[in-house]
């Protein structure tokens, strides 16, 4: 496997970008020459006729990564739908060779890559008459292990166990699970963590509390500073 990790979520809006940014912040703070990569992003915001990929901007700002967004994210779409559909609507075909070459350029410059997926593991990236490419195929293309981000709330046991089984059946390796939005005082959250660990046999490497304001970088950094950095670093092989 290449020197990096691919962050996957049990669903869209589960906290992948938040966790990705936090992990990259920790790595860079502790002297690791690490970067971000996201193959395709939908739902970008247009500012002065320029599309700004929100996830890429958030991760870069939080971690102190200073790169052109296009270097980190080769495909950026304004339409807020799955990449395969945004690609079709905007008439911009997604080319796997472009994704691979873009990733390799980032890899040449940095020692470790924290890559982020789009949506969940079965998110379609390309769909045409010739083929259907899912997020799992992008992970295989980049030859990376995965780290799964799951919710702490109701329904998480089912979503997480199914995602783990799917990832394993796809022949991919899961290094661990991060539970996002966790409240120690919530009996459901505590039991979810216990059952997820039992049913998946995967290490839960971090329990991250809910953040009131995702734009408060000072608060976010404190949350990640309070985590067990050595455990995270060892888990992802950074």
UniProtKB/Swiss-Prot annotation:
Reaction catalyzed: (7R,8S)-7,8-diammoniononanoate + CO2 + ATP = (4R,5S)-dethiobiotin + ADP + phosphate + 3 H(+)
InterPro entries in alphabetical order: DTB_synth_BioD (IPR004472), P-loop_NTPase (IPR027417)
GO cellular component: cytosol
Chief location of this protein within or outside the cell: cytoplasm
Annotated binding of Mg(2+), by residue: 17, 55, 116
Keyword Oxidoreductase in annotation: no
Recorded metabolic or biological pathway in which this protein acts: Cofactor biosynthesis; biotin biosynthesis; biotin from 7,8-diaminononanoate: step 1/2
EC number: 6.3.3.3
Subcellular location(s) per record: Cytoplasm
Record GO terms (molecular function): ATP binding; dethiobiotin synthase activity; magnesium ion binding
Protein keywords: ATP-binding, Biotin biosynthesis, Cytoplasm, Ligase, Magnesium, Metal-binding, Nucleotide-binding
Amino acids binding ATP: 13-18, 55, 116-119, 209-211, 216
GO biological processes: biotin biosynthetic process
Cofactor dependence: Mg(2+)
Residues the entry annotates as binding substrate: 42
Pfam families documented for this protein: AAA_26 (PF13500)
Family matches, as Gene3D superfamilies: P-loop containing nucleotide triphosphate hydrolases (3.40.50.300)
Active site annotation, chain numbering: 38
HAMAP family linked: BioD
Quaternary assembly: Homodimer.
Entry's family note: Belongs to the dethiobiotin synthetase family.
Biological role stated in the UniProt entry: Catalyzes a mechanistically unusual reaction, the ATP-dependent insertion of CO2 between the N7 and N8 nitrogen atoms of 7,8-diaminopelargonic acid (DAPA, also called 7,8-diammoniononanoate) to form a ureido ring.
Listed PANTHER family: ATP-DEPENDENT DETHIOBIOTIN SYNTHETASE BIOD 2, DETHIOBIOTIN SYNTHETASE
Stated name of the protein: ATP-dependent dethiobiotin synthetase BioD
